[in-house]
């Protein structure tokens, strides 16, 4: 049977060798092996070429019909399979928390909440964080890890061990040929920075989610949940994540729920992108050196390791916006401009990861940063296996949250804040798109139009000088030279315009790309909160109608309260880093603009002084 795939999203070809896709279109695959996140196939119009692997779902068997409600005995792992189906799932893990149905204990301790998790049972809509592609990150053995990457090692080889040719510290952005037009796409559609990122198939939902949908698929942000790790959240100064089954918490502050700060903050540099080879030079890849400040021990990672980490984090965290990685590309992977652009994107990504109070302390992230993979591959594999077999995922994420017992939130106020943030993200997304378009167009004009126009002016001045040189009078020589120098000055100013976007506009567009990824994550996070509020309203109505006990309705409201704390904490963190990042970037932009115009002024002043001696 010929390999086929179904397009999950529309894709418009932009480069030679690519083909366009339409959503739901069925394609024929030339090979199931992806090439750096791209597949080759033939679309329904007979065009053959490359397209992103993340945009399609491989069809391996006839699509199943709607699953019948199998009752309590049915495998829970099929509760959240989307209409198009997933790849075959691993066996469902055993129930991790038998006491989930126990009632809430006294306010002094945290008990696992019972069934009836407050979430509506709407149909599942695969999202960017859930369906980053039909090619999903491996959850299986280390052999799967190796086979998926076509690599004899699960870690990046240290520089010098394989191949050579370290790249210098590339601070420049993309060249004039591709810098202005080839920026990150800015759209809240799921084609943002997709690359070949795959989020693994979700594990079996816990009791928190099983009661809600009565066999219907649930929104991915509830069922496709992720463990938090050692981080914490607080209501003002009062909500934290817990390692065990309860921790002391402090009272709420003036800003509402906030993530508790990381007690051991750190940063991580990404340097020395190095081209390496394997299989006697048949395969090449780029390795990056990471140096966390809290260990000062360098580790080397490939992009596929970042890709794997992203998939684990996207699986762990339901109400945390995991920043998107810079996108992949199949061609030009070893060009200096692309390596520089990707490195800058990874630096922004790492900055947001290290500054997030929860993500920064996550075990899998710390393993990624600190495991000396080149000298202890066994430890790397053990940490990888531990992350992939972690049972604290799905709705079990909320079991790791501890909120102040007396800090119940006003659900109407919560709903108002969520609605306000939803409007904010929509407006910010539109504004980011507009600014990105304007910056792209302005950069293009500087690189091509402004440079050309200034050089035309310079050429005209030199033509005038050459005409004046026909006069052989001695007193005319100084003027001729001054006018020629003026022409050269305008040529130099044109070059300054062509080089300037790398210094000011490109960094702004890089920041917009990162935040556009965040904005693409929030609809799912908001959807979880909205569903929880809807479930609370339904439970209250059922109590009034005598269809539900008051105790059960109170439990639903308590669990909605937990979701509200987490959601508002993430929203608050987003605003904090937004203010920090855009303040810093706007300062940098204006400083670079000032430096640029000072250079232009200096060129003009030098030309002006040439006339003093005429």
UniProtKB/Swiss-Prot annotation:
Domain characteristics, as noted in the entry: The PX domain mediates interaction with membranes enriched in phosphatidylinositol 4,5-bisphosphate.
UniProt source species: Mus musculus (Mouse)
Occurrences of domain SH3 (ranges): 1-61
A GO molecular-function descriptor: phosphatidylinositol binding
Ranges of residues in domain BAR: 411-614
Keywords in alphabetical order: Cell cycle, Cell division, Cell membrane, Cytoplasmic vesicle, Endocytosis, Endosome, Lipid-binding, Membrane, Mitosis, Protein transport, SH3 domain, Transport
UniProt region (Disordered), positions on chain: 85-218
Subunit note: Heterodimer with SNX9. Interacts with ITCH. Interacts with dynamin-2 (DNM2), SYNJ1 and WASL. Interacts with the AP-1 complex. Interacts with FCHSD1 (via the F-BAR domain).
Biased composition (Acidic residues): 141-151
The gene coding this protein: Snx18
Binding site for a 1,2-diacyl-sn-glycero-3-phospho-(1D-myo-inositol-4,5-bisphosphate): 302, 304, 342
Name of the featured protein: Sorting nexin-18
Keyword Endoplasmic reticulum applies: no
């Amino acid at each position: 049977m010929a390999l086929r795939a179904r397009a999950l999203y529309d894709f418009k070809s932009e480069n030679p060798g690519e083909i366009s896709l339409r959503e739901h279109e069925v394609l024929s695959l030339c090979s199931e092996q992806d090439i750096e996140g791209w597949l080759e196939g033939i679309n329904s119009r007979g065009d053959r070429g490359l397209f992103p692997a993340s945009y399609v779902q491989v069809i391996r068997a006839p699509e199943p019909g709607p699953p019948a409600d199998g009752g309590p005995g049915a495998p829970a792992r099929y509760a959240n399979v989307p209409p198009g189906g997933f790849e075959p799932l691993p066996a469902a893990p055993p129930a991790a928390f038998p006491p989930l149905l126990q009632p809430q204990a006294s306010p002094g301790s945290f008990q696992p909440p019972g069934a009836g998790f407050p979430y509506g049972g709407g149909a599942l809509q695969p999202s960017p964080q859930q369906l980053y592609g039909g090619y999903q990150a491996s959850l299986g053995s280390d052999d799967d890890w190796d086979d998926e990457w076509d690599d004899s090692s699960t870690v990046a080889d240290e520089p010098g061990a394989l191949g050579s040719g370290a790249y210098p510290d590339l601070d420049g952005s993309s060249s004039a040929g591709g810098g202005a037009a080839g920026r990150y796409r800015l759209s809240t559609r799921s084609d943002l920075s997709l690359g070949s990122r795959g989020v693994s198939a979700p594990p079996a939902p816990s009791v928190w989610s099983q009661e809600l949908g009565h066999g219907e698929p649930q929104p991915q942000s509830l069922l496709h949940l992720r463990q938090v790790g050692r981080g914490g959240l607080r209501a003002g100064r009062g909500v934290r994540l817990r390692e065990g089954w309860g921790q002391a918490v402090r009272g709420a502050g003036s800003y509402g729920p906030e993530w508790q700060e990381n007690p051991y903050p750190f940063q991580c540099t990404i340097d020395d992108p190095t081209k390496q080879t394997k299989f006697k030079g048949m395969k090449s890849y780029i390795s990056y050196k990471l140096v966390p400040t809290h260990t000062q021990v360098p580790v080397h990672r490939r992009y596929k390791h970042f890709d794997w980490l992203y998939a684990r984090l996207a699986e762990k965290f339901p109400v945390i916006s995991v920043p998107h990685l810079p996108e992949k590309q199949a061609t030009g992977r070893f060009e200096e401009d692309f390596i520089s652009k990707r490195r800058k994107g990874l630096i922004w990504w790492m900055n947001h990861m290290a500054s997030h109070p929860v993500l920064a302390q996550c075990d899998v992230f710390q393993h990624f940063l600190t495991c000396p993979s080149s000298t202890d591959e066994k430890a790397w594999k053990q940490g990888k296996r531990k992350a992939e077999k972690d049972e604290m995922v799905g709705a079990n994420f909320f079991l790791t949250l501890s909120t102040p017992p007396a800090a119940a939130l006003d659900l109407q106020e919560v709903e108002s804040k969520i609605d306000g943030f939803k409007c904010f993200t929509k407006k910010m997304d539109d504004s980011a798109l507009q600014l990105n378009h304007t910056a792209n167009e302005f950069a293009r004009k500087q690189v091509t139009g402004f440079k050309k126009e200034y050089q035309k002016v310079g050429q005209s001045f030199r033509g005038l000088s050459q005409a004046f040189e026909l006069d052989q009078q001695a007193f005319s020589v100084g003027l001729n030279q001054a006018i020629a120098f003026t022409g050269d000055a305008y040529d130099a100013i044109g070059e300054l315009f062509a080089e300037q976007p790398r210094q000011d506009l490109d960094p702004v567009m890089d920041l917009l790309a990162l935040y556009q990824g965040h904005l693409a994550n929030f609809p799912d996070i908001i959807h979880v909160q909205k569903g929880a509020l809807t479930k609370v309203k339904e439970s209250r109505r059922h109590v009034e109608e005598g269809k539900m006990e008051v105790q059960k309705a109170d439990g639903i409201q308590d669990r909605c309260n937990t979701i509200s704390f987490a959601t508002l904490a993430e929203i608050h963190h987003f605003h904090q880093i937004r203010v920090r990042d855009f303040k810093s970037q706007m300062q940098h932009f204006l400083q670079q603009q000032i430096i640029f115009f000072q250079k232009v002024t200096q060129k003009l002043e030098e030309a002006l002084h040439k006339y003093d001696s005429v």
